[in-house]
């Protein structure tokens, strides 16, 4: 099979950067930083298809797209980095994320790549969005290892800056 048709067989290089400015004149983001080792990334765009009918048959179809929601599963994120991207407070002296119940996540950009086939890649860049969630759990140790991962939701929206 031609390499450009290869299946997705992996994901890596998950990076994030806080957006400094998103205006009609400028789009400026911090230097991207490695977010965490990625296990799975699944995305779905919110779409709406509206057909119009004339003379008793469909004549046209109008398609709109809303935000894209990505569910990102990683091995774990350092507490300071999780607080930074989830818009929570971080106490560097104790290493604790302080959850006040009022997150204020910054707009940020993310990028990653899917492995395609044996040695190809498909690169993704979402230029603006926010993280939410931070689903995490732990269980008591036992004679079996019970591995738990960390799950984030990234909701991508349009930039103000026109490309």
Regions found by a protein language model. Give the residues of each.
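Polar/acidic, low-complexity leader/linker segments enriched in S/T/G and N/D
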Residues: 1-42
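N-terminal "mature-chain" segments and other terminal, solvent-exposed stretches
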Residues: 37-38, 45-55
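Short acidic (Asp/Glu) patches
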Residues: 50-58, 87-97, 134-139
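Oligomerization/assembly interface segments of phage tail-like spikes and tubes
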Residues: 57-81, 146-159
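Ordered, amphipathic secondary-structure segments that act as subunit-interaction surfaces
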Residues: 65-104
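Beta-strand elements of well-folded, non-transmembrane domains
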Residues: 74-78, 114-118, 130-133, 156-160
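Short helix-loop boundary/capping segments
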Residues: 101-134
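Mixed-charge, glycine-accented linear interaction segment located at domain edges/termini
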Residues: 131-163
